[in-house]
């Protein structure tokens, strides 16, 4: 054995402690940059953004035949109401589709956060039924419905806000308004605190 190998045997190998940096919540500007810079997905009427979870627009929601063909079993309308996307349980009568509606405005001052947990639970419960598929939609499928899908991924799939955005954007371009992004930031911070990652 040469002297170099002997020295290596005698000298203990010191490995530096791995530094795990705490989670840094994203700023509104960095989220908006992420939403605009990473645009790669094509925008169609309906896209599967997570296993058995679809994000779409009003056109997709009104095409009952296509929904049935895709195996959609549950529809979440985040633009419900007479002057928005006026579907509803009555619209889907005679089909196997279950309906959940939220009357939400695509307005930065609208508090969509009050719906995060109830709708996320509805989506989770629906996805736990074998062979279920869920469509979450609004008028364009980029702001209100995208915000709800992001909240679901954060709450029940344990994703950070950035991870959730990147996951969805790999399949569909989205652009939640600034008020919804702020509400998602609050959710992100709360979830990170509750899990001890902040």
From Swiss-Prot:
Pfam families for the chain: DSPc
UniProt-recorded name of the protein: Dual specificity protein phosphatase 13B
Tissues and organs where the protein is expressed, per its UniProt entry: Most abundantly expressed in the testis.
Residues forming the catalytic site: 138
Any GO MF annotation of the entry: protein serine/threonine phosphatase activity
Enzymatic reactions: O-phospho-L-tyrosyl-[protein] + H2O = L-tyrosyl-[protein] + phosphate; O-phospho-L-seryl-[protein] + H2O = L-seryl-[protein] + phosphate; O-phospho-L-threonyl-[protein] + H2O = L-threonyl-[protein] + phosphate
Domain spans labelled Tyrosine-protein phosphatase: 45-193
Keyword Flavoprotein on entry: no
Entry's EC annotation: 3.1.3.16, 3.1.3.48
Function, in words: Dual specificity phosphatase that dephosphorylates MAPK8/JNK and MAPK14/p38, but not MAPK1/ERK2, in vitro. Exhibits intrinsic phosphatase activity towards both phospho-seryl/threonyl and -tyrosyl residues, with similar specific activities in vitro.
Family note: Belongs to the protein-tyrosine phosphatase family. Non-receptor class dual specificity subfamily.
Native species: Mus musculus (Mouse)
Keywords for this protein: Hydrolase, Protein phosphatase
SMART domains noted in UniProt: DSPc
Domain of life: Eukaryota
């Amino acid at each position: 054995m040469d002297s170099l190998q002997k020295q290596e045997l005698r000298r203990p190998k010191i490995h530096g402690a791995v530094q795990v940096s705490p989670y840094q919540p994203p700023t509104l500007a960095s989220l908006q940059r992420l939403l605009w810079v990473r645009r790669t997905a094509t925008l169609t009427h309906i896209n599967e953004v997570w296993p058995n979870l679809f994000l779409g627009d009003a056109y997709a929601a009104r095409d009952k035949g296509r929904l049935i063909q895709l195996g959609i079993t549950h529809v979440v309308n985040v633009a419900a109401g007479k002057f928005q996307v006026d579907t509803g349980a009555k619209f889907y009568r005679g089909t196997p589709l279950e309906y959940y509606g939220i009357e939400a405005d695509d307005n930065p001052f609208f508090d969509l956060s009050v719906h995060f947990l109830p709708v996320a639970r509805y989506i989770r419960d629906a996805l736990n039924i074998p062979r279920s598929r869920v469509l979450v939609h609004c008028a364009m499928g980029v702001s209100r419905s995208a915000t709800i899908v992001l909240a679901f991924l954060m709450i029940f799939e344990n994703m950070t806000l950035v991870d959730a955005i990147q996951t969805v954007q790999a399949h569909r371009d989205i652009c939640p308004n600034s008020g919804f992004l702020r509400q998602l930031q609050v959710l992100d911070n709360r979830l990170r605190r509750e899990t001890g990652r902040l």
